[in-house]
Regions:
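Mature extracellular/luminal domains of secreted and GPI-anchored eukaryotic proteins, especially small
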Residues: 1-196
Length: 196
């Protein structure tokens, strides 16, 4: 309800999902898979990611996408949004430095599950020729759908902090050596994407 959400669109999106039996069941499943043990390192990332893929594949997009893309005006809302998909299990490795972005990219390119999703994301989210950095009107929804399909893959993206709406896989380009430009190009698909 709007009153209990207090203007927080992420809370409103969670409440809407909870009110729908299918969305609630799929959300309960991924939360159970991703929070097993609740201690760092206790989760089985492959099971967590599989449950997240099921959530987006089987849940109604009208309910799943608002959880992923809710807009926030304050850090508390942004942190809730960042935590929605249990990043400690699905996204990052707590206590460890992020790997070079080339590592998850290479895993994705070898994966029959991830590769077509990444290619679809690249096609749907690339700026149109001559449009500069702006997102063409007809691509916005396609890009968001393709982005949602990456959640639960080797290149699972998430919000990078609670101070912005920037998204990226859990990685950086500091240790990419002579492939730094390739690494930054991949990371830029997320952090410099005007369609997201």
């Amino acid at each position: 309800s709007a009153s209990s959400a207090g203007g927080n669109r992420c809370v409103a999106a969670a409440e809407a999902c909870t009110a729908d039996a299918q969305c609630r069941q799929l959300r309960t499943e991924y939360v159970a898979r991703c929070l097993v043990g609740a201690a760092p390192g206790d989760c089985v990332r492959s099971r967590c990611r599989r449950a997240l893929r099921r959530f987006f594949a089987r849940g109604p997009a009208a309910l799943t996408h608002p959880l992923l893309f809710c807009s926030c005006a304050d850090p508390a809302c942004a942190e809730r949004r960042r935590q929605t998909f249990v990043p400690a299990c699905a996204f990052a490795s707590p206590g460890r430095a992020p790997p070079s972005c080339l590592a998850p990219l290479e895993r994705c390119e070898r994966s029959p599950l991830c590769r077509p999703r990444l290619l679809a994301f690249q096609a749907a989210c690339a700026p149109a020729p001559g449009s500069g950095n702006s997102c063409p009107q007809d691509r916005g929804r396609l890009c968001l759908h393709a982005y949602a399909r990456l959640v639960g893959t080797a290149v699972t993206p998430n919000y990078v902090d609670n101070a912005s709406a920037r998204v990226a896989p859990w990685c950086d380009c500091g240790a990419s050596g002579n492939r730094h430009e390739e690494c930054e190009a991949f990371r830029g698909l997320f952090i410099r994407n005007s369609c997201l």
